[in-house]
Design a protein with these regions (language model features):
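P-loop NTP-binding/switch modules centered on Walker-like glycine-rich loops
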Residues: 56, 178, 182-263
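Short catalytic/signature loops enriched in Gly
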Residues: 20, 139-145, 233-328
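A short, proline-enriched helix->beta-strand linker immediately N-terminal to the Walker B motif
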Residues: 167-171
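ABC ATPase NBD coupling module
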Residues: 58-59, 75-91, 109, 117, ...
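Conserved ABC ATPase signature
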Residues: 147-152, 156
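Conserved ABC transporter NBD signature motif
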Residues: 63-74
Length: 328
């Protein structure tokens, strides 16, 4: 199946403390129609910046090279009506819904705003908003439209935000850690909603998270990012059982387990780095337990291996060792 979204060697530079710095480096990804792709990594790895690049929500002054293609068209070249149509095709669900709503506006106002801009009547916009709320499991939609954000729990407000994105009937949903601020039970409910919507509507989903297990539970494939670069992309089940990159294996070991005690919790040595802080060769080399001299001398390309892609010069020789270590 051809890709709906394709990123090819995407590099983004932003002003950081007055200087242009690289925040994404040669990012290459694809998402097919109806596919869920997980994007996993520590804070600062470039996950959110990748989503914002796709949505064309980068700050002023950003320098972008490489390609972002949507349905075969170069996103950076879209203007006017074509750009508006593209933005209607892309829904964005943010981590903290309260940071993206006006606290003094009723739920119905911000839900129907986009529809009203397209000359949809108030009555029809409200009807469609109520239907969208029902699709995400929110009952008594008419009453909810008259409420304010502070009257809703975090989980309920996140459902409202998902419903609002559905009103433009997007083909691509960018979910940027949409469950991080929620309790475990509500997190599972929201994930089930996203997965059901994706399957029922054929949505392409980019699901951003720091949780490797969460991505594996709902995503067909998972891409792992470190220091602004993709270091591994693979079918989710294979990535969990047989990781190709030492960083993926380290994430697998560090994930919390139900039977873990304080003495048995594992962390990744060192600290995560942004793209402009990382060394020019392998960005993970300062923290990697398998580092050799050549790892610090050359920047590995993203290359094909065993049905996936990996950015590591030692990937073939380490495979067996990484598979064992990922299971603790």
């Amino acid at each position: 199946m051809s890709a709906l979204v394709e990123l090819e060697n995407l590099t983004v530079r932003l002003l950081v403390e007055g200087e242009l710095q690289t925040v994404l480096s040669d990012v290459s990804l694809t998402i097919a129609p109806g596919e869920a792709l997980g994007l996993v990594g520590e804070s600062g790895s470039g996950k959110s910046m990748t989503a914002r690049s796709i949505a064309r929500l980068l700050p002023a002054g950003a320098e972008v090279s490489g390609a972002i293609r949507y349905d075969g068209r170069e996103v950076g070249e879209l203007r006017g009506r074509d750009l508006r149509a593209y933005r209607g095709d892309v829904g964005f669900v943010f981590q903290d819904p309260r940071a993206h709503v006006n606290p003094v506006r009723q739920i119905g106002d911000f839900m129907t705003e986009a529809l009203r801009l397209h000359d949809v009547s108030r009555a029809d916009a409200s009807r469609r908003a109520i239907a969208a709320l029902a699709d995400v499991g929110v009952k008594d939609g008419e009453r909810r439209l008259g409420q304010y954000p502070h009257e809703l729990s975090g989980g309920l407000l996140q459902r409202v935000m998902i419903a609002a994105t559905l009103l433009t009937e997007p083909r691509l949903l960018l979910a940027d850690e949409p469950t991080t601020a929620l309790d475990v039970t509500t997190q599972a409910e929201v994930m089930a909603i996203l997965d059901e919507l994706r399957r029922d509507r054929g949505l392409a989903l980019l699901f951003i998270t720091h949780d490797l297990d969460l991505a594996g539970a709902v995503c067909d494939r998972t891409a792992v990012m470190y220091a602004g670069a993709v270091v591994e992309t693979r079918d989710s089940d294979k990535l969990h059982s047989d990781p190709l990159h030492p960083y993926t294996a380290a994430l697998a070991v560090a994930r919390p387990r139900v039977d873990a005690t304080a003495e048995r919790l594992t962390t990744i040595a060192g600290r995560s780095q942004s793209a402009y802080e990382a060394p020019p060769a392998c960005p993970f080399s300062p923290r990697c337990p398998h580092v050799q001299d050549r790892c610090t001398e050359e920047r590995p390309p993203l290359r094909e291996l065993d049905g996936g892609q990996v950015r590591c010069v030692r990937a073939e020789e380490l495979r067996g060792d990484l598979a064992v270590s990922s299971h603790g």
